[in-house]
Amino acid sequence: MKHFQHIEPNRISLNGKRHYIVPEGLAVSEGLVLPSLTTVLSATAPVGKIMALMNWRKRVGVEEANRRTRMAADRGTWMHKIIEDFFNEQDIETALELSPKYRPYFDAICDFLLTIDQCVLAESAIAYGFDPGFGYTGTFDQLAIIGGQYVLIDWKTSYKEKPDYQLADYRQQLGGYAQAIEQMYGIEIDRALCVIAVYDPEDPESKPSRQIIEADGGELVALGALVRQRTVQYFINHYPGSRPFTLTMDRG
């Protein structure tokens, strides 16, 4: 079995946006300060998407928008922790009993979890570099083996199923993480999945369900190319100085 090193993320903030300092031992130069993949996708989002978000916040009100954003972050953190505990063979029943409002999200993906043969890496940092000296970083959710294939999995939660026009960034996130993992570990990602646990706690008729977005082969390559284009755009329009700089790590 190939060795996969787990890499802890080293996050910093530049102009209020998340970046990482590249650790040693990777193909990308140590100490480079690169934007996270989610930062790249957020900062280079089409105007229409930005306007839609602003209109939503205006429609529901700032207080309600902030409440929903906090709830989404909280349930996402809980979901990632319960999945991690599941694969580490921890006692998850206690956690499920202590968080009944989140349990439906786990129920939505429980049978899918059983199709995963092995969790290879989880919550591990990536760094991807490409000419002419640009790159991005991030933390992917899970690299797994399903049916003898390497499969990248991104876990998400949602109140409702997402329409296709809202999934472009989810797909590009898969492509970005996949090409980074391939560069770092010298493997081929056969499939990439975004698994969304869907449940609306404010709808008494809502039942747990899931939505799966899948990309493989040529589509992943094309998605990765789009991510590279948006990364260059990020450096030109948002990165201090428009070129990657290096921070020297104090090992003392």
Task: List where the protein language model places each region.
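Solvent-exposed, non-transmembrane amphipathic alpha-helical segments
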Residues: 99-103, 197, 201, 243
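Mg2+/Mn2+-dependent nuclease catalytic core
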Residues: 124-233, 238
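Feature targets compositionally biased, intrinsically disordered low-complexity regions
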Residues: 15, 24, 30, 47, ...
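Glycine- and charge-rich intrinsically disordered segments
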Residues: 1-5, 10, 234-252
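Polar low-complexity intrinsically disordered regions enriched in Ser/Thr and small residues
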Residues: 19, 28, 34, 51, ...
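Metal-dependent nuclease catalytic cores that hydrolyze phosphodiester bonds in DNA/RNA
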Residues: 1-137
